[in-house]
């Protein structure tokens, strides 16, 4: 900004004849009309000479006689200079003269008549509540709350969505492979390349990271689920094997004890220690030992360490005559030929031998109602029984 005043030229301008004796190179030229100045007074602004009639404002063309302002080689009056280069109103984008009263909102400056609501055009006075938008526009409180309620209702009914093309998606995916969380300048570059808003790019990366995290969590949960299912399946299989094994081996201990008493009662035995097993006779003594031969058929298999033998069928019991009871307090050992050797306490040695390969017992055929279903060999259901000695 420069300020200049009209100054008189050195010496009074003489008439033309006198001027003819002066070289023309010494006569100044006007910066406005490029003519030699032959006036009495010469105006000098920006080190240039002007006719008094040529020094005018570049905007309003008003002659400048008292004061002027210059910028970039042009001369302006005070009003036009501040309009062009002074502080501008945020609303109308016009310059504000320094003598005019203004209103300010944060860093924005307004004319008095421009400081108004953009919706209802009501001029805001001192003390009125208003909302300042990012671009400097003003909205009064009543209109802002009304517009916000309308926006909320419309947002609930219709939600705007951003459509991303295949090319844009490919660019974003490649950038995600390089860096799942890119810096701001990378997002700005992607925004310029794809044409998407920077906020859209940022939200896409946030959603992508959340999706990857959710997929990893679901994959881990699926692996643990498969592990637990396999463990449960293996435990269930072993449990079924145990149950099937228990079914193959017979019944439980309580059922076995009950059925044992039932069978023995039907067979005519009086107690569980088989004290009357000696009633089964019909054997032939041979060299201090005897063999049990009731029906001409040998018995099945006797358990190792068992002090008694169970006949193959109840019919074989009725055909055997009675003889004297066996001696108590016998000591038993197992013979290699599937037999049992009984040693008497007084040195009397008797061998109770039962050969394997006899007929199949009818206890497991279900032919009689009084006999439950058992496996073919008594060894399978007498395995877990405890037999007290005589």
Swiss-Prot record:
Cellular location(s): Nucleus
Which keywords has UniProt assigned to this entry? DNA-binding, Homeobox, LIM domain, Metal-binding, Nucleus, Repeat, Transcription, Transcription regulation, Zinc
Query: Which residue ranges are recorded for the region named Interaction with 5-mCpG DNA?
Result: 199-211
Would the keyword Lipid metabolism be found if you checked this record's keyword annotation? no
Q: Which residues bind DNA?
A: 157-216
The record's Gene Ontology biological-process terms are: animal organ morphogenesis; apoptotic process; medial motor column neuron differentiation; motor neuron axon guidance; negative regulation of apoptotic process; placenta development
GO molecular function, a single term? DNA-binding transcription activator activity, RNA polymerase II-specific
Instruction: Identify the GO cellular component terms for this protein.
Output: nucleoplasm
Gene3D superfamilies (UniProt xref): Cysteine Rich Protein, Homeodomain-like
Query: Could you say which tissues express the protein in this record?
Result: Transient expression in ventrolateral regions of the developing neural tube and hindbrain.
The record ties this protein, via Pfam families, to: Homeodomain, LIM
- LIM zinc-binding domain spans which residues? 28-87, 88-150
- Taxonomically, the superkingdom here is Eukaryota
* Residues covered by region (Interaction with DNA): 161-181
PANTHER family (UniProt xref): LIM/HOMEOBOX PROTEIN LHX, LIM_HOMEOBOX PROTEIN LHX4
Instruction: Relate the protein's function as given in its record.
Output: May play a critical role in the development of respiratory control mechanisms and in the normal growth and maturation of the lung. Binds preferentially to methylated DNA.
What is the protein's name according to its record?
A: LIM/homeobox protein Lhx4
Q: Which gene encodes it?
A: Lhx4
